[in-house]
Structure formats: C-alpha cells, structure tokens
C-alpha cells in the first residue's frame, strides 16, 4: 500500500521480500531508464512473468548491459532484436555471480544488487571506476549487510536477508541543482544559495569541474541525513576558464554534462571532455545533440566518439533548439539563454515536467526570462 504524496511525504507499507505479486498489465516506465533497470533487477528474481515498456525515447535505448548479467544469474529476459525495450522478464531462482562491469554504471550495479537480494549465494559487482552508491547506502539504511563499496570499486551482498522499514529524508537533487549552479556561474553579479542538496561524494563531479573552471563555490551546514551527506551550496559569479576534464570525474558528473557544456560555452578558452562515450546512450545522444545546439548558438564545437571540445565565447546567439525530448538538454539550453543576445526557443520539452516539476517557475523566480509555450 502506498499513501501519498502528501506535502512532499510518501508512506509505503511493505509486503516483505516474498510478497510481490504479478502485475495485471505491462508496467510503463515512461522516459525513465533508471526505473526500468532497477525494476528489471527486482523482477528478475520474482516467481512470475512481467513486461516493462516505455515511451519512444526509452524504447530506443540499449539495455543489453543489464540483460547479460541478469541472464547469467538465471533470469530469462526478451527484448527487441535491437536489444531495446519492451522487456519481457520471466523470473527465476537466481544464483549470485561475480560480475566485472565493462563500463561504470550505477544503474547496472544497482540492478544486480537488487537481484542479488533474492539470489542464492553472494553477488559481487566490481566497477572500473567509482560511480554512485545511493543503492548501497539505501540498503544499509534498511538494515541489509553489504561488504565493500565506496571508496572501494567492489561491493557484494549475500542473498536471502531481510529489509527493515525505515524513514528516508530525500535531499535536493544535485543533478537538478546543476542547472542553477551553472546559471549563477555564467551570470555577472549572480549570488545563489541552494539548500539541503545531496553532496554524496560519488555525485559531486559537477562541483569539482566548476571549481576547476574558476567558479566561486562553497559548502555550508554540511551534515549527514539518512546515510547521505547534504549541504547548502553557495555560488557566486566568477569568470570561467576552459579546462581539460579529468576522465576520472566522468562517472561522478555523468548526468550534469549538458549543463556543464553550457558553462564551457561561456568560458574563456577551450574545454575538452574525453572518456564520456556513455553520454551517447542517454535519453538522447547528448554529445551530438548538445553539439548541434551549441553550434546553432554560434559556438565552435568538435565532437569525438567519447567526448567533445567546446571553444567558449563571450556571448551566445539565439536559435530554435530541438532537445530531442531530452529533459536535461532542454533545461541546459534554457540556462544558456542567460548569455544569449537573442531569444532561444527549446522544442520537445515535455519530459522536463517529469524529472523537474516546477522548473520553469523556479527558473523564473531565480531570474531567467522564461515562459512555456503551449503546443
């Protein structure tokens, strides 16, 4: 039973580890790759069949990276010939595996850990680079024992345990905060404080990259809530400079790069990102879509299979930008309007309402000259 949401609160009454029932219809994930991957891990261990579907964008995203290890654990999962959703899952009695991830992905890691809760024996996941550890912190918060994890690249758990109900305080999302951090960083005279933001060290690559570019940024009131570090983030405008981004920071800022590309477009000099091929299989090909949009604004951009080079400029032009239904790209170009000499219109923005309800109102409150255009 789920009660709410009510004033930001949601109450969930659990049914225990063996209490889930077969869904009566396909489960629609909308545009959420995270939801699909996490539920795939959970459903792979259930004694029933289920089907996961999504919107047009999600249905074009490759899911082989979770299907392969889940199949090794014993699940049967069918997709399209292209390896994309819909995903038909026939649950099974799973066995734990040792899995070396070829690409750092918190979603793949989390999917396997959730499947491992029900598996016989130990499920061990090793990541090639440190990535987000929210799932590990959450499971520990629910009383489940894990070994390893951040700052080590290996984490494991033994199946068959139990989860204990707990209260969770969800901090403000740093991926959403990134748009406002960049907005302040590129707007002369801006001073901004964002309160109670999650600053999990596996997520703060955006802060480190902005610092290296010259942003005037500090943390206050640092504390830990529900196993997650939180803080108030202060940022003041300061001239930014182009940098070569350390590839080690890529998994720590993977969802923030659309906003960071806008910062790079407003910086003095050239910013180079490599080792970020993961950006090509997000809600859109974020390397190409961002490059196309920045070029429309007059920015010199070079793309690579695994990254991008952006030559900053003192001002941007105006244009009509196709976000390709990618919420983060839509919000990034909204922020770019702060340095544009004429109007920027962003198309296909409907998914912004899913990931960041109230973005337009909050952006207007922060000082952006922004309005929604009815279809």
Predicted regions and their residues:
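Structural preference for solvent-exposed beta-strand-turn elements
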Residues: 1-375
């Amino acid at each position: 039973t789920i009660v709410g949401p009510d004033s930001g609160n949601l109450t969930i009454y659990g049914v225990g580890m063996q209490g889930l029932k077969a869904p009566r219809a396909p489960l629609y994930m909308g545009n959420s790759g995270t939801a699909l991957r996490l539920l795939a891990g959970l459903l792979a261990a259930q004694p029933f069949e289920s089907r996961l579907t999504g919107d047009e964008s999600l249905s074009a995203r490759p899911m082989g990276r979770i299907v392969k290890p889940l199949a090794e654990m014993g699940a049967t999962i069918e997709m399209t010939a292209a390896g994309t959703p819909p995903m038909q899952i026939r649950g099974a009695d799973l066995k734990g595996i040792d899995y070396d991830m070829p690409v750092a992905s918190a979603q793949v890691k989390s999917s396997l850990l959730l499947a491992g809760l029900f598996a016989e024996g130990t499920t061990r996941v090793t990541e090639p680079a440190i990535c987000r550890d929210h799932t590990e912190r959450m499971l520990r918060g629910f009383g489940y024992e894990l070994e390893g994890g951040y700052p080590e690249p290996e984490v494991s758990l033994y199946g068959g345990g139990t989860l204990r109900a707990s209260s969770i305080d969800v901090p403000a999302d740093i991926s959403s905060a990134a748009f406002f951090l960049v907005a302040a960083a590129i707007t002369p005279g801006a001073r901004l404080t964002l309160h109670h933001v999650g600053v999990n060290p596996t997520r703060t690559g955006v802060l480190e990259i902005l610092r290296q570019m010259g942003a005037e940024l500090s943390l206050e009131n640092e504390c830990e809530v529900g196993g997650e570090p939180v803080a108030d983030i202060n940022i003041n405008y300061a001239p930014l400079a182009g940098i070569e981004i350390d590839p080690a920071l890529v998994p720590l800022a993977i969802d923030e790069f659309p906003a960071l590309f806008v910062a790079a477009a407003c910086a003095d000099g050239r910013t180079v990102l490599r080792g970020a091929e993961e950006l090509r299989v997000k809600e859109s090909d974020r390397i190409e879509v961002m490059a196309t949009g920045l070029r429309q604004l007059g920015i010199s951009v070079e793309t690579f299979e695994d990254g991008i080079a952006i030559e900053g400029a003192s001002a941007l032009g105006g244009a009509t930008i196709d976000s390709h239904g990618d919420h983060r790209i839509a919000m990034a170009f909204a922020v770019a309007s702060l340095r544009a000499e004429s109007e920027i219109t962003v198309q296909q923005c409907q998914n912004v309402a899913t990931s960041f309800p109230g973005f337009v109102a909050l952006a207007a409150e922060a000082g952006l000259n922004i309005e929604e255009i009815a279809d």
